[in-house]
Amino acid sequence: MTAPTIDAPDVQVLNRADLTRRLVAKLKCDEAVVAGIGNTNFDLYAAGHRPQNFYMLGSMGLACPIALGVALAQPERGVIALEGDGSILMALGCLTTIGMVKPRNLTIVIMDNGIYQITGKQKAATAVTADVVAIARGAGIADSHWVRDATHFETLMSRRFDEGGPLLLAAKIDDQGGTAQTPRDPALIRQRFMRGLGTGRQSALDA
């Protein structure tokens, strides 16, 4: 991983799977997690599969827009968007919308390894010039932070939903592969998630 110059010189390179396990350990039972494509949702599936998890399949850049929709539709539910840096670069417009409407129940976690990992490790703009925390702050998400280390991540996650607006955390991570493979069944994923949010009906898919 090649890291750009960012306004956080003490940031450590962390492991995505470990951070995901720490995130899952902090979840309350009713919180929804929308995970972006590839290793981001593979690690979430491995760390703790639950009906409130939504795993993206091929829709790069849509974790934040979907999480925003859930947060606005169910304002009493905590919602977390778990996204990679390459995917968030495809959805920068969504950050401006989040910065404008400021849903206090939304947390965004960006795993930044500076590459498009599952397509061949091509270099992303985050490895050269783009600072996603600075971009988020510029978009109006004032409570945006680089994660310094694993303990700092847990501390920041513990105070999510306590402030008056959304929280965005970005972590520099290594390029280790995913720790599991999410079942690629869109209907099953959708139905379980709807059931987890209390909006779906009982189905044969709820195995």
Sequence positions of predicted segments:
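Active-site-proximal loop->helix
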Residues: G93-V101, I118-I135
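Glycine-rich beta-alpha junction loops
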Residues: I37-T40, N113-I115, K172-G178
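Thiamine diphosphate
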Residues: D43-D112
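Conserved thiamine diphosphate
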Residues: A3, K123-R159
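Active-site diphosphate/adenylate-binding microenvironment
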Residues: T2-M60
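Glycine/aspartate-rich loop-and-adjacent alpha/beta segment that forms the canonical ThDP
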Residues: M1-D7, L14-D18, C29, R50, ...
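General beta-strand structural signal in soluble alpha/beta enzymes
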Residues: V33-I37, Y55-G58, A81, H145-R148, ...
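Short acidic, glycine/serine/threonine-rich loops at helix termini
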Residues: L44-A47, T119-K123, A180-R184
